[in-house]
């Protein structure tokens, strides 16, 4: 039996985490929630994650720093970056580091699910190549 994709949500806003959990689990994916990048890194989740949704502004490591850390650690996790304060420089940094999408909060269901589909397709393509 094929496993359910595991989506990690890293956002310091509990209401955002819960809203994303409700949406993502409603389409059949497993969701794990984290209030900080450090909580995510300290868990066993990175090795199992099929896609990470990262807020830019987090306590401690930012979402962009987490994205870079995962890449340095050899974790090929597709990343979707979400933020309330979108600017061109931050978007350019996220995309240059390999983000699948850079989304401004509030994110619509359709936009997020489309980005998730693209991220999971990239993860599948990476697994086929390796």
Question: Across the structure, where does each feature detected by a protein language model lie?
Answer:
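Two-component/phosphorelay signaling modules centered on CheY-like receiver
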Residues: 14-32
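The feature encodes the CheY-like receiver
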Residues: 17, 59, 87
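Acidic, metal-coordinating helix/loop segments flanking the phosphotransfer/catalytic sites
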Residues: 33-51
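Acidic catalytic/metal-coordinating carboxylates
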Residues: 35-36, 62-65
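Short amphipathic alpha-helix used as the core "switch/output" element in two-component signaling
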Residues: 42, 64-75
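Alpha4 helix (beta4-alpha4-beta5 surface) of REC/receiver domains from two-component response regulators
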Residues: 65, 86-101
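C-terminal output helix
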Residues: 89, 107-117
């Amino acid at each position: 039996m094929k496993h359910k994709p595991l989506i990690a949500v890293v956002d310091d806003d509990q209401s955002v985490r819960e809203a994303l959990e409700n949406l993502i689990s409603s389409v059949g994916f497993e969701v794990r929630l984290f209030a900080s990048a450090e909580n995510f890194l300290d868990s066993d989740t990175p090795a199992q994650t099929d896609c990470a949704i990262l807020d830019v502004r987090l306590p401690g490591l930012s979402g962009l720093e987490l994205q870079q850390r995962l890449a340095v650690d050899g974790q090929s996790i597709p990343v979707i970056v979400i933020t309330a304060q979108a600017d061109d420089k931050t978007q350019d940094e996220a995309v240059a580091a390999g983000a699948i999408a850079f989304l401004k909060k509030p994110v619509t269901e359709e936009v997020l699910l489309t980005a998730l589909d693209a991220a999971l397709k990239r993860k599948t393509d990476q697994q086929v190549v390796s």
